């Protein structure tokens, strides 16, 4: 019971102190507003400096991943393999799909593939003469369904290839640059050595970051269903691993896969790690913004000290009367520092709310096929900003508070 009574007394005393602090803030509202603005600018600058480093780096890496693959991506060339053996190719595809890492294969063909949009595939023989005149100038990429795991390929509409082994269908995906050519749900393709037309379903549009019209074909479906189009010259393996294995281990694993399936020669092309080249530039920019934010907060400290001392000159008589009627030195320090901390807490809440809604608002305005994923709020930087704001408030109010605590009650009689 005594503890409860003591707790209630402490609570009542805390509310009384808070009430005094709020009344104290009403004495000079303009001064407190200017102090809050200076703190607000410093906190926003600190959060912005972290955002530039994190979001800026994420944006650059995401854009580069559209062209060069997620970092790091290793490339290997395959030549001299038995690409025409259906059984061996099926085993090869099966092993590639079951790899624990992200592995995709692109194939270069001996013959050029031409593609044309059609309104319907029900009567190709009747429209074959006109179809050849509608062929569009596009790059054709034969690849596996895991290609969009290696490269950052957000979908503008539709879907990517189905990686299921069951019910393989002939489908293609076009990029945004080729979208104007393929305004229908169907397309046909053929090779130079044949007049037969092969129908495809246009299943999606992808943002691959290039201005060159490109069509992506499911290589596994072509190998299964269109043997006259499956005339492979060589292949390239793209390997992205997050497990930290070395290039030599990848080479050894791929070499074993080839030995067990289609055979051939394996050569290392190289490593795509272009995203890391931006680290130094972003680090310098982030450091500059951090220094700027700390300078702004330092100026805020000086401003608070100056305002606190000038306010102390105006409130000397009031504080002396408080001392004369029984206020302790600790009460005076609490009153002066409490005002600064109250402003700091309020500014922190406002700053974090504004910056949070700005970050979330930026994500809402991103297009569906944006290479950058949903933006994440930098919680760590917000915590650092709050701690820094409290420290700034304490430093800014400490000198005026200590000076106010040294006032002698006898001076109130003057």
Segments (PLM) and residue ranges:
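N-terminal Sec/SRP start-transfer signal
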Residues: 1-45, 414
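Transmembrane alpha-helical interface segments in multi-pass membrane proteins
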Residues: 30-41, 46, 294-303, 309-311, ...
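Membrane-proximal extracellular/periplasmic loop immediately following the first transmembrane helix
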Residues: 50-147, 253
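Structural beta->alpha junctions
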Residues: 78-83, 133-134, 205-209, 238-245
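Hydrophobic secondary-structure segments that place a key small or acidic residue at a functional site
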Residues: 131-232
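A cross-kingdom feature of multi-pass membrane systems that activates on extracytoplasmic/periplasmic
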Residues: 235-286
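N-terminal membrane-entry
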Residues: 278-296, 380
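Hydrophobic alpha-helical transmembrane segments of membrane transport and translocation systems
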Residues: 394-414
